Design a protein with these regions (language model features):
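Hydrophobic alpha-helical membrane segments
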Residues: 1-260
Length: 260
């Protein structure tokens, strides 16, 4: 059974949802995971592999930590495209059929121009954070050569360096907020209705602004579960990332409606 993609005639509009709605998204995401565990675990395994590569190649250099974290941020949403497609297939099948992994692997082709522009814009945002991070480290250490990762960990959490920690995490939080706001429902929207990148990002920001507390809870859930995945030496990501992606599809369905 092929999944069709509708050309939108209506404009996407954000709507208000219940404050604790993210808990329902998470529940639905786990339910979807149980319906197609093998397909979801394939994507989860890729996230785990990315985590190990990040650790392997960035153990002794902060530049590489940031670089590979950037790659993770850029590649992550595009891996999620396949999981969004799996969620969409489940909706289309309505329990009568099996999702196709091969279909999900090529889902990005349905709206290639929009996804390409999205990747470019996200790359600009993440590269901006990359440059700001290097600048802050350089100013903090006041040296031409960047410190080792061990030096950063040891010195950054020294009480004497509290000003650096506050500034670093404040700037990082700002960048994270921007990326979250423009992406929380934009990729599912671009996949589902084939809208352009700017329209999808605007709808995503509107969804966040209309549901500040709700989206704050959703962001906290994402961060908390991702942290669990990292502290389990990335093994937890094999389940956590697919569940979060599938849950994000349900978030999109709840947060976005269409009007003429």
């Amino acid at each position: 059974m092929d999944v069709t993609h509708d050309i939108p005639r209506d404009r996407p509009v954000a709507r208000k949802v219940e404050t604790l709605r993210p808990l329902q998204w998470l529940k639905k995401g786990f339910r979807d995971f149980q319906k197609a565990p093998a397909d979801c675990l394939f994507y989860g395994a890729v996230f785990v592999l990315m985590g190990y590569l990040l650790t392997l190649y960035s153990e002794h250099s902060p530049e590489l930590v940031i670089t590979f974290a950037t790659i993770f941020l850029l590649a992550g949403p595009f891996l999620a495209i396949g999981l969004y497609d799996i969620a969409k297939q489940m909706e289309a099948f309505d329990g009568h059929g099996r999702v196709k992994l091969a279909h999900s692997l090529s889902a990005w082709r349905v709206n290639l121009p929009a996804f390409t522009l999205y990747a470019a814009l996200l790359a600009v945002l993440v590269f901006g954070w990359f440059r700001v991070s290097l600048l802050m480290f350089a100013l903090f250490y006041d040296t031409a050569a960047l410190p080792s990762l061990n030096d950063i960990v040891v010195n950054a959490f020294n009480p004497d360096n509290i000003a650096f920690l506050v500034a670093y995490f404040a700037v990082g939080f700002l960048f994270a907020q921007v990326v979250f706001s423009v992406s929380v429902v934009s990729i599912p929207l671009m996949l589902d209705k084939e809208v352009d990148t700017v329209t999808a990002m605007i709808a995503s920001v509107q969804a966040v602004l209309k549901n500040l507390l709700t989206m704050g809870i959703w962001a906290a859930i994402i961060v908390a579960l991702s942290a669990v995945g990292f502290v389990t030496y990335f093994l937890g990501l094999i389940i956590i990332m697919p569940v979060l992606a599938l849950a994000s599809w349900h978030a999109y369905r709840d947060l976005i409606t269409f009007e003429r």
